[in-house]
Each structure stands twice: as structure tokens, then as C-alpha cells.
UniProtKB/Swiss-Prot annotation:
APOE exists as multiple glycosylated and sialylated glycoforms within cells and in plasma. The extent of glycosylation and sialylation are tissue and context specific. Glycated in plasma VLDL. Heparin binds at L156, R157, K158, R159, G219, K220, Q221, L222, R223, G224, R225, L226. This is Apolipoprotein E. Residues 152-162 are annotated as: LDL and other lipoprotein receptors binding. Keywords: Chylomicron, Endosome, Extracellular matrix, Glycoprotein, HDL, Heparin-binding, Lipid transport, Lipid-binding, Oxidation, Phosphoprotein, Repeat, Secreted, Signal, Transport, VLDL. Its main location: secreted. Residues 261-273 are annotated as: Specificity for association with VLDL. Homotetramer. May interact with ABCA1; functionally associated with ABCA1 in the biogenesis of HDLs. May interact with APP/A4 amyloid-beta peptide; the interaction is extremely stable in vitro but its physiological significance is unclear. May interact with MAPT. May interact with MAP2. In the cerebrospinal fluid, interacts with secreted SORL1. Interacts with PMEL; this allows the loading of PMEL luminal fragment on ILVs to induce fibril nucleation. It is found in: Secreted; Secreted, Extracellular space; Secreted, Extracellular space, Extracellular matrix; Extracellular vesicle. Disulfide bonds: none annotated. One of its GO terms (molecular function) is very-low-density lipoprotein particle receptor binding. The lineage of its organism: Eukaryota, Metazoa, Chordata, Craniata, Vertebrata.
Length: 299
């Protein structure tokens, strides 16, 4: 039993020693001091966390209030806003890129951005937890809390550095894609300008011709157009003549047919009337003859 207790005590002492043993300092990239706005904002956050890690008397005093977490919140928001602004700026130049490639790059960049934001959020939450523990002091000494906080901050700074470098690389890929799209846009503009310059050169050459030559060219073009119109008019006139001749022939044929039908309709009627008239005359003559007395002979 004594041996077991001794082992437990040694283990606890070794763990405490491991907590307070200093780790190598994490060196931040120099580019965070002179890079993009988001890198400068992240550098300010990084410097603030490094100052908090010193756990000086001033840090201890501010950690017991909400000042440190408030300042970290402002630095976090500045960093993420700068990242979003830089990403939006690059997206404006990614228009010529294929949609699937652009979607993949955007998804990877958002994931890296979220990881960095989570790292900064965890730093702030850890400091808030330390403040609560210091105020409560639940069975722990201040030295133990400070040692544990220092260890956590070192680990968080390492992870934040790794995620920041990953975000930096993905933004570089994004920027390369934007540069490639911009180069394609410049090439298209260059080709368009070349075409416009060639058109301007042709116009300038035509403008530089003597007025007489230009007038002759216009006159020749006008004569050709007049000949074309005259030929079209003659063809149209001949076509109208043929159509009028066809109409005349049709009208004559219809008139002759109508005359034939009219004659066939009237002739039987006239013949019948003539026959009836002759019969009537014969009847009248017969009646008149019958009614006239025969003269008597005298002795």
C-alpha cells in the first residue's frame, strides 16, 4: 500500500513539473508584420496573446476583470473581417475560373478560415475560464492555475500558428487563381484592342484617299445599284404583262361561255313564243272567216 501511494505521489509531482516546465517559444512569421491587412490583424492578436502568456502582475490584474476577453474579441473580429474582405477581393478576380474549381477553392478556404476563428475563440474562452477559476479558487492554488493556463496557451498558440499558415497557403492558391483569371482577362482585352486598332488603321487608310477616287468609287457603286434596280423593275413589268394577258384570256373565255349559255337559254324560249304566236294568228283568222256572212245572189 505504501509503495502504491509512493508511485501516485511521484506521478503527480511529475505531472505538475511537466505543467510548469517551459516549452520552446513559438516564433510567428515575419510576414504578419508587413503582409496583407488580415495578416497584420492576426499579428496584433498574436502579440496580445504572447503578452498574456507572460502572466505579469498587470496581466493577472486584467485577467481578473473582463478587459482581456473584450480586447481579444475586438482583435478576433478585426482579423476575421480582414480575412473576409481579402477573400471577397480575390473572388472578384476569379470570374474567368471554372465554377467547379472556384467552388472547391472557396470551400477549402472557408474551412481553413473557420479553423483559425475557432482557435482564437478557444483562446478567449480559456482565459475566461481562468478568470472564473481564479475567482472561485475551488481547491486549487493560484500557482497551479497559472501553470495550467500557461501550458494551455502554449498549445493553443502552436495550433493557431499551424492553422494560420494553412489559411495563408490556401489564400495564396486563391490569389494564384485570381492572377491567372486576371491574365486571361488582360489577354482578351489585348486582343480586342488589337482588333480595334486594325479597324482604325483601315478607316484611316480610306480617309486618306483622294476625294476624286472616293467619288469615283461611290459613283461606280451607285451605278451598279441603279442597274440592279432597273433590271428588277423590268423583270417585274414583264411579269405584270404576262399576268394581265392571262387575265384577259380568262375574261374572254368566261364571256364566250356566258354568251353560249345565254343563247342556249333564250333560243328555245323565242322559238316557243314564235310557234304560239303563229297558232294564235291562225286561230284568229279562222274565227274571222267563220263570222263573215256569204253575200246573196239577186234574180
Amino acid at each position: 500500500m505504501k509503495v502504491l501511494c509512493t508511485v501516485l505521489v511521484v506521478t503527480l509531482l511529475a505531472g505538475c513539473r511537466a505543467d510548469v516546465e517551459p516549452e520552446p517559444e513559438v516564433l510567428e512569421p515575419a510576414v504578419w508584420k508587413s503582409g496583407q491587412p488580415w495578416e497584420l490583424a492576426l499579428g496584433r492578436f498574436w502579440d496580445y496573446v504572447r503578452w498574456v502568456q507572460t502572466l505579469s502582475d498587470q496581466v493577472q490584474e486584467e485577467l481578473l476583470s473582463s478587459q482581456v476577453t473584450q480586447e481579444l474579441t475586438v482583435l478576433m473580429e478585426d482579423t476575421m473581417k480582414a480575412v473576409k474582405a481579402y477573400k471577397s477581393e480575390l473572388e472578384q478576380e476569379l470570374v474567368p475560373m471554372a465554377e467547379d474549381t472556384k467552388a472547391r477553392l472557396s470551400k477549402e478556404l472557408q474551412a481553413a478560415q473557420a479553423r483559425l476563428g475557432a482557435d482564437m475563440e478557444e483562446v478567449r474562452n480559456r482565459l475566461a475560464q481562468y478568470r472564473n477559476e481564479m475567482q472561485a479558487m475551488l481547491g486549487q492554488s493560484a500557482d497551479e492555475l497559472r501553470a495550467r493556463l500557461a501550458s494551455h496557451l502554449r498549445k493553443l498558440r502552436k495550433r493557431m500558428l499551424r492553422d494560420a499558415e494553412d489559411l495563408q497557403k490556401r489564400l495564396a492558391v486563391y490569389k494564384d487563381g485570381a492572377s491567372e483569371g486576371a491574365e486571361r482577362g488582360v489577354s482578351a482585352i489585348r486582343e480586342r484592342l488589337g482588333s480595334l486598332v486594325e479597324q482604325s488603321r483601315v478607316r484611316a487608310a480610306l480617309t486618306g484617299q483622294p476625294l476624286q477616287e472616293r467619288a469615283q468609287a461611290w459613283g461606280k457603286q451607285l451605278r451598279g445599284r441603279l442597274e440592279e434596280v432597273r433590271g428588277q423593275a423590268q423583270d417585274r413589268l414583264e411579269e405584270m404583262r404576262e399576268q394581265m394577258e392571262e387575265v384577259r384570256v380568262k375574261i374572254e373565255e368566261q364571256a364566250e361561255a356566258f354568251q353560249t349559255r345565254l343563247k342556249g337559254w333564250f333560243e328555245p324560249m323565242v322559238e316557243d313564243m314564235r310557234r304560239q304566236w303563229a297558232d294564235l294568228i291562225e286561230k284568229v283568222q279562222a274565227a274571222v272567216g267563220a263570222s263573215t256572212p256569204v253575200p246573196s245572189q239577186k234574180p
